[in-house]
Each structure stands twice: as C-alpha cells, then as structure tokens.
Amino acid sequence: MRNRTRIAWTFLVPTLVLMAMVAGWPLGRSIWFSLTDTSINDISAGKFIGLANYFGEFGLFANPNYTEGFWKSDWGLSIRNTFQFSIVSVVLETLAGLGVAMLLNQDFKGRTLARAAVLIPWAIPTIVSAKMWGWMLHDQYGLINQVLLDWGLIAHKIAWTADPSYALWTVVAVDVWKTTPFMALLILAALQTLPKDCYEAARVDGVHPLRLFWKVTLPLIKQPLMVAMVFRMLDALRIFDLIYVLTSNNSTTISMSGFVRREMVENGNLGYGSAASTSLTLIIFLSAVLFMRTARLKLSEESS
Amino acid sequence: MNSRQSCHLAAVALALWTTASSQAASLTISCGSNAAQVASCTKFAEEWGKKTGNTVSLYQAPASTSEALALLRQQFAAKASELDVIMVDLVWPGIIKDHLVDLKKYSKGAEAKFFPAIVANNTVGGKLLAMPWYANVGLLYYRKDLLEKYGLKPPETWANLAAAAKKVQEAERTAGVKDFQGFVFQGKAYEGLTCNALEWVYSFGGGEIVDAAGSITINNDKAARALDAAASWVGTITPGGVLNYAEEESRGVFQKGEALFMRNWAYAWALGQAADSPIKGKIGVSPLPAGPGGKKVATLGGWQLAVSKYSKNVDLAADLVLYLTSREVQKKRAIEGSYNPTIVDLYNDKDILAVNPFMGSLTDIVGSAVARPSTVTGAKYPEVSNAFWDATYDVLAKKASGAEAMKKLQGKLKQVKRSQW
C-alpha cells in the first residue's frame, strides 16, 4: 500500500510543481500585489497597505468618493454590465443550443457535414470574428446596415457598436452567434446517451412530441444541461475580447475584466488593479456556487 | 598546415569577427503604426544605417496611443532591452521619465532651434528626455469645392460651422448623396477624444481641465456649454457612429467624399492629396473655429524621439535620434509626408511651402496651441485623461448633460489626485 502511495506521488509531483510555477505563483503574486500600492513605474517600490485597495478611502467597495452610490461608480457599473451580459447571453445560448442539438440529433442526409459546419463560429478565433463583425456592423459602410436599409426594416443607419443603448446587446448577439455551437455540442453529447427504448415506447403509445420533450427528454438531460450552463456562465463573466474589439470601451459598457485591464495596464496601478482582479475571481466563484446550489446540481455519482 | 599556423589563423579570424560585429550594431526603432509613418521612418532610418554601417529594424507599435503607452510601460517594468529608439507622444515624458536617457550631452545645444514650448515639455527635472520630431495640431479640413458651390466661407465660430454643415448636408442628401455628413471628428473613448474635447472647452473659454498650478478647474459652465454644443452635433450633422471613430475612421469618411468638415491632425493632408484620393485638389485647411467670446485654439500634439535607458547601444541610438530630427531629414519629411517640422525656421522654407501652402499659417497655430495637462499631473495623467474622455463621451452619447458630467468629473479627478499630483 505504501509503495502504491509512493508511486502515486511520483506521478503527481511533476504536475503539481508545474502547476505551482505556472498557476500558483502568479496567482499568489497577484493577491500579494492587491495588498500593496504597487505602480508599474517601479514594481519593487510597493508598500503593504492591507485591505485599503478593497475597503479603504480610495478603494473598490465602500468608497466615500462614489458621489452617486456604488452601482453608478465605474466598478459597480462594470459588475452590473457583466452580469447583464452574462445572464442574457447564457439564456439565449442555451435555448438556441438546445434547438440546434435537437435538430442535429435527428437522422438526415448530410448530418455529419451539418455537425461539422455548425462548429465554424466557435472555431474562428474571437479576435478575428469580432473584427469581422465590427466591419459588418460599421454604421457608414457596414453590410448589416445596408441590408436592413434595403429591406426597409430600418429608416436610417444605426450605429450598432457606438450607440450606448445598442452596444451591449450587439455584443450579446455576436457572443450568441459565437458560442451557440459550443452549447449545442455539449447538449448533443447528452442527447446521444439517452436510451432509445423510452422513445420507442412513447411512439407506440402515440404521445405528443412536445409532451415527450417536457416529460422525458428535458429531465434526463437536466444534469448535463446545467453543467454546460455553469461552464458558459463562468466564461461569460470573464468576457473581455468582444467588448474590447467591438465597442468604444468607455465606462458605461465596460466589463469587469475590462475594468481590471484599464486599471492595471492603462493606468499602471498594479496594486489597485490586482485588487479588482482578485475581487473578480471571488465574484465568479460565488456566482458559480450560488448557481449550482439553486439548480441542485449533484456532480457526484449518486443519481436521483 | 601545422597546429601553430592554424592557431594563428583562428586568432586572426576571431579578431576580424569581433571587430566586424562590434561595428555593425543592430538597433530597433519604434516609430509609427500606420503604413505611411512606417514607410517614412524606415526610409530615413535605413539611410542612417547605410551611412554608419549599422542595421535598423522596425518595431510596429499599436495604432491607439493609449495602447502603445501601456505596452511601453510594461516593457520598461521588465527592463527590456529590445527597443532602442522610441517615438514618444507629447504627453508621455512626464509619465515615463524614469526610463529615458538624458539627450543633452548628445544634442550639444541643437534644441535651441526647436519650438521652445515643445522642448520645455520634453525637459523633466532638467533632463532633455526626447528630441521633438514632428509637431501636430488639430486642424479643420473642409471641402473647398462644396463651400464654393453653396457660397460659404470657412467657418470662424462653431455656430457657423454647425449652420454651414447643416445647410450643405441637407442639400447634398436631397441631391442624391445619401450618407453625406456635415462634420466628422474623433469621438471614440480614447486619448484622441481628450484632444478634441479640450479644443471645444478651451475655445469656449472653459480652461484646460487642470491649470498650471494643479487646481481642478474643469467644473465651470463654459466647459459645460462647450460639451453640450458638441453633443448637439451628434445625430444631426455628425453620424452617431462618431462615438467609435478614431483618426483613421473619420478620415475614411472624409476621404471618400462623404463629409464637408473634418477635424484631424496634419497627416491627413498628404493622404487626401495622394494620387488615388477621391478628393484630391478639393480640400482646404483652416484653424479650428472659436466658441462664443472665446478664441481659436488647437490641441498641441506631436511626437518626439527618445532613447530607452535599457538599450544596449545608447550612444548609437542617440546618434540615430539626432539624425532623424536633423534639419535635412525634417525638411524631406515635411515635403514628402506633410509632417510639421519642429524647427521653427523651416516654416519659412520655400520648398516646404510649395507643397504644403497652409504650413505658413501653422507657426501661429502651433505657437498658440493648448497643451494637455500632462506635465502638471505627471504619472497620473493617463487617469486624468481617462476621466475626462469618459465624461465627454457621456455627454456626446446624451447620457448626461454637460453640467452633470463636469460635476462628476470633478469628483473623479479629486479621487485621482488624492493628496497631490
């Protein structure tokens, strides 16, 4: 037994060391920075200031200089924007993904080709597809405005990515386009594991397809569906690249990751920015835990 | 041959190799992002390379100046030696002063012929941190053929500009040019918007955000009125998409012939007069208009050349800097690319004026240009600029009135200032 433990440790140690170097040390340093007032101008000159970056006079939360309240401040606004984006985006992607998965589950000619084709939006790197969409959505010489104008659906050209009232929802639309294949694939994998005899019996009994969906399919894929939603939600809460490339990046549409980048990279406040990124991690962790609690997600082997 | 001869041969070869490699240094210069800048810079850097027997390779910086600064600061934090010569924006010396070499001992007084304001801007703590390379001011470009067609003159005030733009825009749209715009400028939330907005605010008499003594002066009604005026253009004479336009996007609309007025930097002239430009020969340039009771003003911009402290070839790099900022090279660049020289007497040069007729009037514009408060706010300038462009963006996007935005901005600037700049 001791021999087996030793062998197990021998196999695990390289991975653990590598993870500590690549993930553990930067994370630890980042958390350490968040407790100091380091600036990028001279990284070695940072002083320890405890939790002042979080709760102090010029901190993230409980800052007395937030003249219009926490939710109108840059940090509060970024939290609100990110959650708005994530919730709408994940719901839409799940519904669309479910539909696409149900379709791809049927047997039809060219099904393999369709399954491969559906993956294309997910496969293109986000920067490339975001730039592409940015050109199509351009207000003066973009394709989308031209097409909508020609079909008479809009009266004059809309500034999709510049107008603050449209910007966030445009980003949601592009994100749904990009990530629906991911959800569809995860749900399809779940659908393929369903036992066929249930459906045979239902067909013999003449059950309505919609009832079949609600009473049989959905409960059976509930667990994988919730897992896919948690994955997507964790991703969506970290959204950065779409907003950065598509929109103008001012404070009203900024996401939490965008705020972190602005503080750390553009303003050079490594201490304050690290505090923001640590808070971001904790917020995402809490959201995931809450979601799994509410969905009563049981990840262990004992099924209901 | 015997071992002694081969030993000698090896020694000679080694000596030759080391002397050859110690002469042919390889420098890296970061000097621009768009194709025209890169081509011009490479040409003159390679000339220097041939003359001195070194090679110069190009490092392409990001297009947005805010991003270029962010990247540069990270490289300085890592003490990277990859960059030798850096093109530095007017507002950067105060921010990156700890990482640049003092050029006074290399320039030997050559800076006396340059614009004093720019040299003063580049001198921090008694050290000359960068040589001025080309000056930039905001200019008003207009379609002189259209102004003639409708019997109008270049506008003297912003109100004139708005009226002229409205008239021509309506007429052109009825005549069939469907997306004709009156006025395009840079409205994206980045440093360029700070430049545009400072022009509006200062020309209305609203001051310069933070004054020379360090007090926050932006919360006044003249500044609020300036921003409200600008917000009134968006959606009427300016497309809503201007909120996402940087320099190239606004130039794209103007160069396609779809705008009457454009506010942009001097580089747009050479590109607008290029052989394949649809508006060649149809553009004019004038100073930006004044606000009511205020005066005409442009934001001072411009780029300088500096040497990184972490470079492995500081002397050679300084030599390259002085070559590129010399009289001959600046004159050639003014003629070929309409880069405004930083040597004052070049503005009276006949050859330059033949190609860029408006440069004669530029001496006054550059001399009276307003600088952004980068020197007084030092390393906190990026945050100050960020807060200012955010506030302006909110007003342009009609999310806040000028007065509300200025009040909020004052609170934010107090937060940035903390106890002192």
Question: What do the predicted segments below correspond to?
Answer:
Chain A
Residues 4-304:
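A structural signal for multi-pass alpha-helical bundles of membrane permease subunits
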